[in-house]
Amino acid sequence: MSDYKLSHLQELEAESIHIIREVAAEFENPVMLYSIGKDSSVMVRLAEKAFAPGKVPFPLMHIDSKWKFKEMIEFRDSYAKKFGWNLIVESNMEAFHAGVGPFTHGSKVHTDLMKTQALLHALDKYKFDAAFGGARRDEEKSRAKERIFSFRDKFHQWDPKNQRPELWDIYNARVHKGESIRVFPLSNWTELDIWQYIRLENIPIVPLYFAKERPCVEIDGNLIMADDDRLPEQYRDQIRMRMVRFRTLGCWPLTGAVESEADTIEKIVEEMMTTTKSERTTRVIDFDQDASMEQKKREGYF
């Protein structure tokens, strides 16, 4: 009898598929949060595999802050149409029409109103009792200590000091009416794992991940790509073409690029082999206050 062994990526894939199926079986109305990034793209592929050849039994939902890169929105719409996903797009239009943005109100207020509050409103609107997210434990310290099945109270708040025990692959999906669970099937993946899986599965991703000459301006130590005409006048004469790519994607004024020559998946994987910094070091919102990400998650952020 031959030995049956799984590779490292196959083990991660099997664990994630098990988690996704568990949620579909345990919850009445789950949703998969779709940020359009590399992790979301992997999570979507895993969901498709989990229920193939059938249709995935829950929708995708994107919280659009109205400040995403243009290429992200184009990719989102074409991907959902090509693969037949039920895509929900929600935004805080009241705050948007009031002129809320990262340049005028700062990253903290912008993130709270355009992302956190928009998310909480959408979860209540559709009465979702479970929401998949693409966060990984290697990204950031508050995410490192969060459970795979992360309990939220009726206000969608997370209490890191009151988390449920999670032994092996046994998950507690019980909630009372109004409570919910955030589920992170990629918790045990690393950034390198993500890229190797993208290469293995030939998963389509936003072109911003690949190095290219792009118009950038340095703001507070970050290389910010000038993606549209909302860049303040004071920075416009500082724009320079730089060979850059993005390790993580978000609102363009709050997401720093990294100088890189990696214009293929293979080169990105090679780059990941030697990097010593988390991709979150280029996200402005992670540093706008002490323990920034943990505080945002307590308030209901992704």
From Swiss-Prot:
What is its EC class?
transferase
- Output the Pfam families linked to this UniProt entry: PAPS_reduct
Q: Keywords assigned by UniProt?
A: ATP-binding, Nucleotide-binding, Nucleotidyltransferase, Transferase
Q: Does this entry carry the keyword Transferase?
A: yes
Domain of life, per lineage: Bacteria
Q: Name one GO molecular function term.
A: sulfate adenylyltransferase (ATP) activity
Give the GO biological process terms: hydrogen sulfide biosynthetic process; sulfate assimilation
Q: What is its EC number?
A: 2.7.7.4
Q: Does the keyword Translocase apply?
A: no
Q: In which pathway does it act?
A: Sulfur metabolism; hydrogen sulfide biosynthesis; sulfite from sulfate: step 1/3
Assigned protein family: Belongs to the PAPS reductase family. CysD subfamily.
Q: What does this protein do?
A: With CysN forms the ATP sulfurylase (ATPS) that catalyzes the adenylation of sulfate producing adenosine 5'-phosphosulfate (APS) and diphosphate, the first enzymatic step in sulfur assimilation pathway. APS synthesis involves the formation of a high-energy phosphoric-sulfuric acid anhydride bond driven by GTP hydrolysis by CysN coupled to ATP hydrolysis by CysD.
What does the subunit section of this Swiss-Prot or TrEMBL entry state?
Heterodimer composed of CysD, the smaller subunit, and CysN.
Q: What is this protein called?
A: Sulfate adenylyltransferase subunit 2
* Organism name: Parabacteroides distasonis (strain ATCC 8503 / DSM 20701 / CIP 104284 / JCM 5825 / NCTC 11152)
